[in-house]
Amino acid sequence: TMPEKYLEGFRNGTRVSYKNSGKPYIHNPAVTIMVPNKEETEALAHEVITKLNKTKGPTALIVPMRGWSAYDQSAEEASIEKGWAKENGDGPVWWPDPDNPKWSRRATLMWDVFMKNWDRNNDNLDIIKCDNHILDVEFAEFLNRCMGDMLDKKWKKGMYRDLKNVVE
């Protein structure tokens, strides 16, 4: 069961519905998938960046622009290994960005909020835009590299800007 205000969002299009059905994606009888709408995504991003701006130690917010879950990917991007079969079409919560359809609209909304509110004077905080999906092996390898550099005290803000999938 889901509160009526959320169901109304699926019906009126303010929430991404499964195959434009006006309904949420029901994974199984116990799990219904619902992701944040535009306003909720922006509020979440603002909350995240407000907290991260206060960091006193090495911190990198690495944003995967091609999607954030198995259900948040285009059919072109989908694979069994990433949790959504290409034959099923777009993931049930995939919301492509109108300016860059290979990127998630939620990711671009969050990125915009991060850029507007990021304390660029905090040398402990870097925000990195990656042309990856969160489930890409290359993305996981990059996260591991970044964490390793932090643990080894080699990390510096801006040090990854020349990597292949780093866009900003």
PLM regions: where:
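Oxyanion-binding "anion nests"
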Residues: 1
